């Protein structure tokens, strides 16, 4: 069963991102939105954790949040808009929002 995991909190304020990365299944995907996109800050531990999963991680970023924080989507991830977020929510069997 595939799950879309959605994180919106800063990776610098708690351990949600690292916890999520530990439990991701092979059919799962991760969408970072809101302050979670700060995981892309250069040289940061969250970015290194994401980069270590490049080969197995299906990763999405909400484009609007990247733009608002002046960050760019890396080549190994996909930047999406809100309509694509809705499509992802339907494509996966479950959606798990890490509140």
Q: What function would you assign to each model-found segment?
A:
Residues 46-70:
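A glycine-rich helix N-cap at a beta->alpha junction
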Residues 3-16, 36-40:
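Short, glycine-rich nucleotide/cofactor-binding loops
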Residues 69-99:
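C-terminal structural segments of small proteins and small subunits
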Residues 43-48, 78-81:
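Charged helix-capping and loop-helix junction motifs
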Residues 27-37:
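A short beta-strand-loop structural module common to alpha/beta enzyme folds
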Residues 7-10, 34, 64, 99:
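Structural motif
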Residues 12-27:
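Histidine-anchored nucleotide/phosphate-binding helix
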């Amino acid at each position: 069963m595939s799950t879309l995991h959605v994180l919106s909190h800063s990776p610098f304020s708690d351990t949600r991102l690292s916890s999520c990365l530990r439990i991701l299944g092979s059919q799962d995907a991760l969408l970072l939105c809101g302050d979670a996109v700060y995981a892309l800050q250069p040289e940061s531990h969250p970015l290194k954790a994401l980069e270590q999963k490049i080969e197995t991680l299906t990763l999405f970023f909400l484009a609007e949040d990247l733009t608002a924080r002046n960050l760019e989507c890396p080549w190994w991830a996909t930047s999406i808009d809100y309509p694509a977020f809705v499509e992802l929510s339907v494509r996966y069997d479950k959606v798990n929002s890490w509140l």
